[in-house]
Amino acid sequence: MPELPEVEITRRGIDTHLAGRVITQISIRNPVLRWPISAGLIALLPGQRINAIARRAKYLLFACSRGTLIMHLGMSGNLRVLPESTPPQLHDHFDLQVDNGMMLRFRDPRRFGAILWWDGDIRQHPLLQKLGPEPLSDDFDGQFLYTKTRGRNASIKEVLMNQHIVVGIGNIYANEALFQAGISPLAAAGSLNTMQCERLVDAVKATLLRAIKAGGSSLRDFTDCEGSPGYFQQQYWVYGRAGQSCRQCGELVSKTRQGQRSTFFCARCQH
């Protein structure tokens, strides 16, 4: 699943091509995603200008003349900017054409993504209004994490992936950040002290920024809007490296399951 770095890479690429452009045509080939794509978008969107493209958590927000188009990549979604004459392929479900002869194409083999319209205050959308802070913002700091973890018996990894506490951190980057912080993913969140929380917040921010700089992680489906893969997977400390030597101490990387997700860690480096 694309996590925050991959969605941010997508946003930056799309913004270069689409911000300020006027939508000319909408094509819906398969409306069946996580929620059905409204056929009303075919008449509603043409003529509207895309004023800005923002990101909230893993949602892409296209601020248009009369509302906001919301996109989520789901498990396998991908957005490409292509010439409008490019023939569609299997799993290409939605096209948004603009006034420079280009289009935004939404491809989603597993169809867990979403394309929604909201004409009110975007902060009040039901999918967005209860989200936690952005992990790269000043609102997410050591004191915030320390406060949010008090009395929690859930593992710190599960808390990091709770979108009501902090957004955008998926399985890959939770594993990597916990290794960088030297904290076991199995530790109860409420057991962390203030110093550990500060160290973990710093590791989360550093890991996400490094991933964005590397173009994100391309393990299965992800490419940026021009079709280029990311390379952060080449820098993984523990994720996907079970049974291999820890790059820091030589101990074999361990693997377990937490909440239906694979967890990777070094028992020597992480406590």
Curated annotation (Swiss-Prot):
InterPro entries xrefs: DNA_glyclase/AP_lyase_DNA-bd, DNA_glyclase_Znf_dom_DNA_BS, Formamido-pyr_DNA_Glyclase, FPG_cat, MutM-like_N-ter, Ribosomal_uS13-like_H2TH, Znf_DNA_glyclase/AP_lyase, Znf_FPG/IleRS
SUPFAM superfamilies assigned: Glucocorticoid receptor-like (DNA-binding domain), N-terminal domain of MutM-like DNA repair proteins, S13-like H2TH domain
Gene3D superfamilies: 1.10.8.50, MutM-like, N-terminal
Any one GO MF annotation of this record: class I DNA-(apurinic or apyrimidinic site) endonuclease activity
GO biological process terms on file: base-excision repair
UniProt keyword annotations, A-Z: DNA damage, DNA repair, DNA-binding, Glycosidase, Hydrolase, Lyase, Metal-binding, Multifunctional enzyme, Zinc, Zinc-finger
Residues annotated for DNA binding in this entry: H91, R110, R152
PROSITE patterns: FPG_CAT, ZF_FPG_1, ZF_FPG_2
Zinc finger (FPG-type): 237-271
Superkingdom of this protein's organism: Bacteria
EC number, as in UniProt: 3.2.2.23, 4.2.99.18
CDD domains membership: EcFpg-like_N (cd08966)
Cofactor(s), by name: Zn(2+)
Catalysed conversion reaction: Hydrolysis of DNA containing ring-opened 7-methylguanine residues, releasing 2,6-diamino-4-hydroxy-5-(N-methyl)formamidopyrimidine; 2'-deoxyribonucleotide-(2'-deoxyribose 5'-phosphate)-2'-deoxyribonucleotide-DNA = a 3'-end 2'-deoxyribonucleotide-(2,3-dehydro-2,3-deoxyribose 5'-phosphate)-DNA + a 5'-end 5'-phospho-2'-deoxyribonucleoside-DNA + H(+)
Cofactor annotation remark: Binds 1 zinc ion per subunit.
SMART domains on file: Fapy_DNA_glyco (SM00898), H2TH (SM01232)
Catalytic residues as annotated in Swiss-Prot or TrEMBL: P2, E3, K58, R261
Subunit field text: Monomer.
HAMAP family: Fapy_DNA_glycosyl
Family membership: Belongs to the FPG family.
Role played: Involved in base excision repair of DNA damaged by oxidation or by mutagenic agents. Acts as a DNA glycosylase that recognizes and removes damaged bases. Has a preference for oxidized purines, such as 7,8-dihydro-8-oxoguanine (8-oxoG). Has AP (apurinic/apyrimidinic) lyase activity and introduces nicks in the DNA strand. Cleaves the DNA backbone by beta-delta elimination to generate a single-strand break at the site of the removed base with both 3'- and 5'-phosphates.
Name of this chain's protein: Formamidopyrimidine-DNA glycosylase
UniProt organism field: Nitrosomonas europaea (strain ATCC 19718 / CIP 103999 / KCTC 2705 / NBRC 14298)
